[in-house]
């Protein structure tokens, strides 16, 4: 007979006395190298959430950064310790805890991966949609024959919603009640129960997650003893006693559960309209009842009203709730076909990485970022009684080795001095930039979730929330969210396509026959005089302008940084034109600006001409060659400047201006009246040869109006023609009172400035 004292007992001793047995103290510690990190699937209050694998098992990895110098370090440490401790509780309706890992200042909490995401994705139909006024308006009109039935869960702004039958909704409520009944049996208060902390697993099994705010209930103080605890949770789901800072117990979870049930029934998010401050944050039944569908089971609605009682003592326990739901389930048939679950993360996973660093698009700093403007060239022509008004444009045309100049450019029909100066010898270097749409590195989620105050650690209720993405954004290929699109132009995608002899304005001289009282009509068509043209891209408007002057040195290439603005080209607005080697460049306030493109360049395959690197090198070589040519032309301009200044001072004198009536020039034109002007016109003939080049001076009029006391030539027209290597210049002014040029300068009405004094010049080869 064996006495009771001799009965063998089990003694759980430490592993020091149990040789050969595995040590379970580090059972939850995970080596970071054993984790495979996938894509980011969510963002909580204290970190990001990634999908991953742990020895072939799909897991969710929550990354939390710990900074000892942070003021929230103490609270964050307590939050992590509490969540890890609560996750050790095991229940089919609780998210399974796998372990913890750390590296550096980051801590990683590993749990099971729940494929369906949070329940709020399937429930809400008015989130980010209704304003409070619209909410109340719909509340009043619910059930009216003239308004649509809001109980129909299939349509929401033309978007199909997941159909949830009432048996399935009751099953969801039952799963949550079972999990909470288990926690309360272990004297644990969740304190943050809400629909975004309920995850949908296989076969629509609900799992409660986010135990960071969990606390132990008062033990030994009787049934439902209250205690003073901090105010935490989500405002719309918190019990009134928690919001008001009163003592509370586990009954606060029952009130939050009742709010979740109301969302399951109405499929609408809880707003301040349901819980006004006038009712001390209790549930407004008058607002709730009109939102309840007509086919809602009455016992289910009664459970909502009981759980949301203002007095905590009048609320049922979760054990009572499970019994009521179980009896209700027996009366309803469970649907055989369940709604499909969404795919929270695509497979396969990426290759293992050392740490879950979020990969972002890295852009080459030498990118052209611009707004495409489809403007066209503008021709500047104005017919006034005083002739062509050029809006005080300072134009000095210096033609170097001029070619293709037709002597028929001057046609005097009906005694009208119609001068057409068609600058058709413009070699416009155009670059056709290939357009590519790149995803902006800007976050593609709804920004309202980033600044939310609900301290949400669920899988999808954050910046990358699939609920927000699919319902409020556009889905593109691969299930990715359509974010802000920025059109970038790679510098390597630019191809040089010079358009030689680009004739922008082909004005026939015969069209300039105007019988307007012998008005001097001057059509100075300089459209397209912008040497560097970028189709679909504006290069000239840059923050680093290129200064080109008489004694300017070699210009530096323009900045490759994105232009701050894109300006439209407006001729005749105090523009100074500089034409170099048949490459006309418009200068506005000493800054290179490009003219708007004539048309958009066609879209083509960006890899058609080789790799991006090779194309970028070709583009750099073209840029260098372009500015080398500009440097050579600038040196030539410096050599010409001195001779030009001397010639202007000697030959362009007021003494050379004299009234003539029938002054026949040596120009070989088909019209015999060439050079003939009326008695009220003044004509000037000047011949100047400098180093084999033809110099064409111009008088600049600073005022478009003619004063009676001063001599103000409103128009001086210059035309050059070639006849047996003899160069002729014909300058015609409008009828005015002739005074010495010095007096005109003194009166500031008509000023001629020598080229050496800083007047911008135009050179054309």
UniProtKB/Swiss-Prot annotation:
Region (Disordered): 371-393, 443-477, 491-527, 545-620, 654-684, 699-738, 746-765
Domain Protein kinase: 35-328
Catalyzed reaction equations: L-seryl-[protein] + ATP = O-phospho-L-seryl-[protein] + ADP + H(+); L-threonyl-[protein] + ATP = O-phospho-L-threonyl-[protein] + ADP + H(+)
Family matches, as InterPro entries: Actin_reg-Ser/Thr_kinase, Kinase-like_dom_sf, Prot_kinase_dom, Protein_kinase_ATP_BS, Ser-Thr/Tyr_kinase_cat_dom, Ser/Thr_kinase_AS
Statement: the UniProt record of this protein carries the keyword Ubl conjugation: no
Sample GO molecular function, one term: ATP binding
Residue ranges with Acidic residues bias: 446-458
Active site: 192 (proton acceptor)
E.C. numbers: 2.7.11.1
Amino acid composition bias (Low complexity), ranges on this chain: 459-470, 499-527, 562-605, 662-678, 699-720
Keyword terms of this UniProt record: ATP-binding, Kinase, Nucleotide-binding, Serine/threonine-protein kinase, Transferase
Source organism superkingdom: Eukaryota
Binding-site list for ATP: 41-49, 62
Pfam families from the UniProt entry: PK_Tyr_Ser-Thr
Record-stated family: Belongs to the protein kinase superfamily. TKL Ser/Thr protein kinase family.
Protein name from the UniProt record: Probable serine/threonine-protein kinase DDB_G0271402
Annotated organism of origin: Dictyostelium discoideum (Social amoeba)
């Amino acid at each position: 007979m064996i006495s009771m004292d001799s009965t063998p007992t089990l003694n759980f001793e430490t592993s020091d006395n149990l040789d050969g047995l595995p040590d379970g103290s580090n059972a939850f510690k995970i080596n970071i190298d054993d984790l495979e990190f996938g894509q980011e699937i969510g963002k909580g209050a204290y970190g990001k959430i990634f999908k991953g694998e742990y020895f072939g098992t799909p897991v969710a990895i929550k990354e939390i950064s710990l900074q000892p110098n942070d003021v929230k370090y103490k609270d964050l440490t307590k939050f992590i310790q509490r969540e890890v401790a609560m996750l050790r509780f095991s229940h089919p309706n609780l998210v399974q805890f796998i372990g913890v890992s750390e590296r550096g200042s980051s801590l990683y909490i590993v749990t099971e991966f729940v494929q369906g995401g949070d329940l709020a994705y399937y429930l809400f139909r008015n989130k980010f949609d209704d304003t409070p006024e619209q909410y109340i308006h719909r509340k009043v009109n619910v059930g009216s024959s003239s308004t649509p039935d809001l109980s129909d869960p299939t349509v929401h702004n033309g978007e199909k919603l997941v159909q949830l039958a009432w048996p399935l909704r009751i099953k969801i409520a039952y799963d949550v009640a079972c999990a909470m009944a288990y926690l309360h049996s272990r004297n644990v208060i969740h304190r943050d129960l809400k629909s975004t902390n309920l995850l949908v697993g296989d076969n629509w099994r609900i799992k409660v997650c986010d135990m960071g705010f969990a606390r132990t209930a008062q033990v030994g103080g009787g049934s439902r003893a209250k205690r003073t605890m901090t105010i935490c949770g989500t405002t719309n789901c918190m019990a009134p006693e928690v919001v008001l800072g009163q003592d509370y117990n586990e009954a606060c979870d029952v009130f939050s559960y009742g709010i979740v049930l109301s969302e399951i029934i109405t499929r609408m998010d809880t707003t301040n309209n349901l819980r006004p401050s006038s009712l001390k944050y209790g549930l407004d039944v008058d607002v709730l009842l009109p939102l309840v569908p007509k086919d809602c089971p009455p016992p289910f609605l009664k459970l909502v009203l009981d759980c949301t009682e203002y007095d905590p003592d009048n609320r049922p326990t979760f054990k009572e709730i499970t019994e009521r739901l179980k009896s209700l389930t027996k009366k309803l048939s469970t649907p055989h076909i369940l709604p499909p679950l969404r795919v929270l993360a695509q497979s396969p996973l990426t290759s293992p990485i050392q740490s879950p660093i979020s990969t972002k698009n890295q852009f080459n700093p030498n990118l052209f970022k611009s707004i495409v403007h489809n403007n066209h060239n503008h021709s500047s022509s104005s017919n006034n009684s005083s002739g062509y008004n050029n809006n005080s444009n300072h134009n000095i045309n210096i033609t170097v080795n001029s070619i293709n100049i037709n002597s028929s450019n001057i046609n005097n029909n009906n005694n009208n001095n119609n001068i057409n100066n068609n600058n058709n010898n413009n070699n416009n270097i155009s670059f056709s930039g290939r357009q590519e749409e790149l995803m902006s590195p800007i976050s593609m989620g709804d920004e309202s979730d980033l600044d939310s105050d609900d301290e949400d650690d669920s899988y999808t209720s954050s910046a990358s929330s699939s609920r927000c993405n699919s319902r409020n954004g556009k889905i593109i290929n691969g299930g990715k969210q359509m974010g802000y699109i920025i059109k970038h132009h790679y510098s390597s995608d630019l191809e040089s396509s010079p358009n030689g002899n680009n004739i922008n304005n082909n004005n026939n001289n015969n069209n300039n026959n105007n019988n307007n009282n012998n008005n001097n009509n001057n059509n100075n068509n300089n459209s397209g005089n912008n040497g560097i043209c970028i189709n679909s891209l504006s290069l000239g408007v840059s923050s680093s302008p290129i200064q080109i002057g008489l004694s300017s040195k070699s210009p530096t290439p323009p900045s490759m940084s994105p232009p701050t603005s894109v300006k439209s080209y407006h001729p005749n607005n105090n523009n100074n034109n500089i034409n170099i080697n048949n490459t006309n460049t418009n200068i506005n306030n000493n800054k290179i600006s490009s003219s708007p493109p004539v048309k958009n360049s066609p879209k083509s395959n960006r890899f058609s001409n080789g790799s991006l690197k090779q194309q970028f090198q070709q583009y750099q070589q073209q840029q260098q060659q372009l500015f080398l040519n500009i440097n050579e032309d600038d040196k030539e301009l410096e050599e010409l400047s001195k001779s030009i200044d001397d010639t202007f001072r000697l030959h362009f004198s007021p003494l050379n201006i004299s009234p003539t009536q029938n002054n026949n020039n040596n120009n070989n034109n088909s019209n015999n009246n060439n050079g003939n002007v009326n008695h009220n016109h003044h004509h000037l003939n000047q011949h100047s040869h400098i180093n084999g080049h033809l110099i064409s001076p111009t008088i600049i009029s600073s005022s478009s109006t003619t004063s009676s006391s001063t001599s103000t030539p409103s128009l001086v027209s210059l035309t050059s023609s070639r006849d047996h290597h003899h160069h002729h210049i014909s300058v015609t002014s409008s009828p005015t009172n002739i005074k010495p040029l010095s007096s005109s300068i003194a009166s500031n009405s008509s000023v001629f400035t020598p080229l050496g004094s800083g007047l911008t010049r135009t050179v054309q080869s």
